[in-house]
Amino acid sequence: MTYQVSIFLENKLGHLEKVTAVLKKAEINIRSLHLNHTANGWGILNLVVSNPELAHKLLNESGMSAALREIVVVKMTDKPGGLDELLKDIVKAGVNFTNAYGRVVNEGVNAFFVIDVQDIPDDRLKLVNVGLEIISDHLVYGIQSL
């Protein structure tokens, strides 16, 4: 299973750095991030890190509001139109996602597309059934390389 850590952050100077300081101290590497503004000066930071369980624990212990959520990471080709091809397959599979972001792994070769879906087991199966490759947590976290 692959997880992201989501942190509810106030949009204030230095708040993101507080997160990165906690992770740096624990030698947790950020593999991918997505920060978006919500409302009234708040945002949600989604992180894929080398040790999500420890990051979740340490961030909460530091007084932050962090959640651990399972995600699906799909391999895509890093080329013009690569995302479009992937999205066509995701639509063909009948999978809807509520949040998404990408990360280039090998420039011009591979990228990861991180998606947040409602029914992880069912949606994973649907994606595999249309020929998409689900990336293992060891590859996502950088424990192994492609």
Where are these regions (language model features)?
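A conserved regulatory-domain signal marking ACT and ACT-like small-molecule sensing domains
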Residues: M1-L146
